[in-house]
Design a protein with these regions (language model features):
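Hot-dog-fold acyl-thioester-processing enzymes
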Residues: 2-86
Length: 86
């Protein structure tokens, strides 16, 4: 596991960001995405696809369990960025 940043990297401009290609700019603490969070996201978005919410069917699928929605993962970016960079 990567430890969260001790001191965040300060990026003043987009131009200065280009010079840091390939560098780790920030890390955040791990975030656990449990089934309750997935189910709540499914309710909020109306996306009840089986791979996300049907544990029995998903157990027979390619991942052996349910998986988080891609948009759920994307929706965590503000939380993760805040934890890593502020």
């Amino acid at each position: 596991m990567t430890e969260p940043n001790a001191a965040p990297v300060h990026i003043a401009t987009l131009a200065s960001l280009a010079g840091r290609v390939g560098e780790v700019l920030a890390t955040s603490p791990w975030v656990t995405i449990d089934q309750q969070r997935i189910d709540l996201f499914a309710q909020a978005t109306g996306d009840h696809q089986w791979i996300h919410v049907d544990r029995e069917r998903a157990a027979q699928g390619p991942f052996g369990t349910t998986i988080a929605h891609g948009f759920l993962t994307l929706s965590l970016l503000p939380e993760l960025a805040n934890a890593a960079m502020v």
